[in-house]
């Protein structure tokens, strides 16, 4: 990644790591206009549980919407990105497997996080992608597109796109 930055005449110091974005916010005081990511599917955050749960207690903390099961940190990555949104408007594109859409009990951590995203009108679009886009797996994946500055005609709406057979 740093070599790509150097070849593009960008500052490689903007690349943080190796570290976990959950316990070590490498861009603590920064906000971004656009963010695109593909966090690892089903990554455990058990090793960072104490840190994450402590930050979740802070109403201004990155994880204040809730904490999911420790076996899947996908929705923690989403909350991390939401915390980096510019107040004047940002967009996020994030690729998930189906877990963030469907797992968790009503009133549980995953459900609370989804509720936060919807009640704050952040979710703009979910696109279901074709299978086998990722090497050696037919897992179904989804692109979530979020915005904190939706067009007026998209306010309080979520667009669902089924692109499963478009590949």
Feature-to-residue mapping (PLM):
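S-adenosyl-L-methionine
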Residues: 2-30
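A conserved structural/catalytic subdomain of Rossmann-like adenosyl-cofactor enzymes
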Residues: 29-167
């Amino acid at each position: 990644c740093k070599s790509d930055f150097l070849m593009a005449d960008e500052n490689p110091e903007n690349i943080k790591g190796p570290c976990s974005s959950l316990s070590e916010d490498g861009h603590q005081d920064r906000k971004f206009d656009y963010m695109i990511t593909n966090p690892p599917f089903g990554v455990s955050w058990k090793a960072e549980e104490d840190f994450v749960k402590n930050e979740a207690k802070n109403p201004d903390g990155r994880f204040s919407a809730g904490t999911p099961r420790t076996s899947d940190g996908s929705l923690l990555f989403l909350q991390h990105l939401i915390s980096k949104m510019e107040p004047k408007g940002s967009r996020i594109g994030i690729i998930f497997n189906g877990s963030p859409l469907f797992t968790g009990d009503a009133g549980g951590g995953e459900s609370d996080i989804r509720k936060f995203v919807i009640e704050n009108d952040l979710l703009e679009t979910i696109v279901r992608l074709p299978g086998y886009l990722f090497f050696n797996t037919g897992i179904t994946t989804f692109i979530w597109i979020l915005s904190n500055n939706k067009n007026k005609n998209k306010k309080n709406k979520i667009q669902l796109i089924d692109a499963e057979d478009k590949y």
